[in-house]
């Protein structure tokens, strides 16, 4: 009887395990392709991607260390990395974002500086720095020589540090069509400000930065500061903007082309946006905002750990942001299963209205250390989501900096994602420490011969095609 009971228990365990594994499996994204933009690992992080609405064959993907830009002229089937995009008169550049305007011109926006201030307290000891843009008139192949300043700070004591810009293009049919907006965090000694500058001449000149909101208190990443600007323009030219502050997503609008803004208010309450994840140096849940230009429905996505582990959430508004829906969980693995989903990015397809979310997903690793890249898609206005695997091979992120975000764009059923991966065979921080101890003890001759490559990241861009109605079916999220 004891043997039979144990045997039945074992069978039950195997049965439940198989059910759990099948529930965690995701179908492959339809017609998925993945390309590596950086063949050799480096400090490549924080990418972005945009599709030219005037010529959807043109796609630009940007990333840092320093500023780099890849481009495709055939809707993502082939990719090339452009040369000499980064500014040469600054030591460091990054925090890139990209957009196409209504003339089909591509823009890359970035910060540039010579040396960071104190870690997490970026305004303390800041050196000359600024926010700049650069233009491409041929879909990303070549970039104009001018690095146009949006805001600059000279090398003087007590200067602010301009950080994490995001560029938005007005591609509506309104009287503000063609406007460009850049929002960012201005770190000062005593507070953090959310500021915005606009251009009405195709990015050639920029307005004096306008303060949208300010957060008093010690301006640090881990102190609830105003950080992580995201913006979108509606079909009537209205600009909607969000960012993280304390445990809330802040929201404001401009109805006059970025000249004035409504009073910023907390629109969506979340858990803190900064959190620790096993094997990752740091992570956050910065939000993004998008709009369906046909229905005018607004969407906001973010990640937080209200369920005990990190999940991706989405909320919608049908009244211009006055009221927001209860959050919908985007990832469809079992709730409270301990698997982390993080570094999401949101894109709404302006043609078919689908809602697309890219994220890293650890549901397939019982140790919750390795992730694949997943894509969630909703065709019912964000009520439910199908989940797809964009990549097959899980990777872990130990010992490398993964930055703060990924990137996503969608147009006419084609979806473009850009992200970072750590290639296999690299040492982690713990492995490096253990190896150094062995080298010190045994002179290191054998170990040095077998020493793996130093840790680093590569940037990959993925495509998926939902325009074919016979594409794969995926499990729905509730």
Model-derived features with residue positions:
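Sequence-pattern detector for short linear motifs
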Residues: 7-9, 201
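Bacterial N-terminal signal peptides
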Residues: 9-19
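N-terminal secretory signal peptides that target proteins for export/translocation
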Residues: 1-6
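Extracellular, repeat-based ectodomains that mediate carbohydrate processing or recognition
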Residues: 24-478
